[in-house]
Structure formats: structure tokens, C-alpha cells
């Protein structure tokens, strides 16, 4: 084997080994891992590991026969099950297949995701009814969180969506939300969010 072929083989072996290590890290973590933490653990530079992550994502996300995929969210990576298999995963975990949100919670969530940061009073005004229990349910489900306080008397809480919201709805960021114009057929929802 020539020196050039030996170097290429060595580089391929190194990449395969690092991809294997990264897969293991993502698997055992169960939580999103920051790219900088992966770099620190495998002792490689940011750009190199970022390229490896892209390759791994292409492998997992491009193969329809696999039941898992890698998602990227705000500079973190996580190994998750594919949405199409959620029904079966839920059966294994013996949870309700659908832990549905009430209409009030869905309305509140729609308003928060399009108008954030927003106060409870502003949500109440848009909906025309009290939203406190709906917002509390969204907070309990980790879809919404306190993002700060409005600098006015009483300093009301500002609400916004969480990374869990993005993961739950398979969004990379809020820019992936459907345009509000898509909801124009449902004037009630459109009017609530546009107010």
C-alpha cells in the first residue's frame, strides 16, 4: 500500500471511529449535546466535528429504514426516534398515545409562538378569556417558559416557547413555523394571532 493510500485509509478509519464515538455519546446522553462539548470529549476541532455531525445526520436522516435520526437545535445535537414511529414508542413506554392539549392550550400556544415574548394579560386580551390554566399546562409540558419580565408596574411575566416545543413539533427554529397567512382560511385563529 502506498504512503498516500495509507494516509487516506488512516483518515477514513479515524473518521469512522469518531463517528462511532459520537453516536455512543448521543445515545447514552438522551439529552441534547452541545457541539463544543462533543469537541472537548473527542478532542477534535469544531469544524471537523461539525462536518462529522453533518455526515452522521445525512446517514440517519436519509435512510428511511432507520427508526432514529439526529436533530440539530441551537448548536446542540440529539439522537431521537423518528416521528413516524412515535405510536409504537409510546406503547412501549405505556404512556397515552396522545396527551392532547385542550383547545384553550392550543390557542394560547399558537399566540405565544407567533407573538413571543408575550404576557398572560396580552394572551387573555387576544383570546377574550382568561388563559392562566392553559398557560400553566403549557409550562408543565415544557412547551412554554418564562422568558423574562416586562419593565412596567407589576413586572408581568413574559412567555415564550422552549427548545422542547421545537423538538416536539420537529422545528429547527421558529423560522420554520408556517406563515400566518396559511391560517387565513380559519379567520378566528388568524384574527387572534394578528391582533
From Swiss-Prot:
A Pfam family: SMC_ScpB
Q: Which InterPro entries match?
A: ScpB_csome_segregation, WH-like_DNA-bd_sf, WH_DNA-bd_sf
- Source domain of life is Bacteria
Report the main location listed first in the record: cytoplasm
Give GO terms for biological process. cell division; chromosome separation; DNA replication
The UniProt entry, under SUPFAM superfamilies, shows: Winged helix' DNA-binding domain
Q: Which GO terms describe its cellular component?
A: cytoplasm
Kindly state which keywords UniProt assigns to this record, in alphabetical order.
Cell cycle, Cell division, Chromosome partition, Cytoplasm
As recorded in UniProt, coiled-coil segments are none
Q: Which NCBIfam families match?
A: SMC-Scp complex subunit ScpB
Described by its record, this protein's role is as follows: Participates in chromosomal partition during cell division. May act via the formation of a condensin-like complex containing Smc and ScpA that pull DNA away from mid-cell into both cell halves.
What's the subunit arrangement here?
Homodimer. Homodimerization may be required to stabilize the binding of ScpA to the Smc head domains. Component of a cohesin-like complex composed of ScpA, ScpB and the Smc homodimer, in which ScpA and ScpB bind to the head domain of Smc. The presence of the three proteins is required for the association of the complex with DNA.
Q: What PANTHER family would the database entry show?
A: SEGREGATION AND CONDENSATION PROTEIN B (PTHR34298:SF2)
Name of the protein described by the UniProt record: Segregation and condensation protein B
Q: Which organism is it from?
A: Clostridium perfringens (strain 13 / Type A)
What is the gene name?
scpB
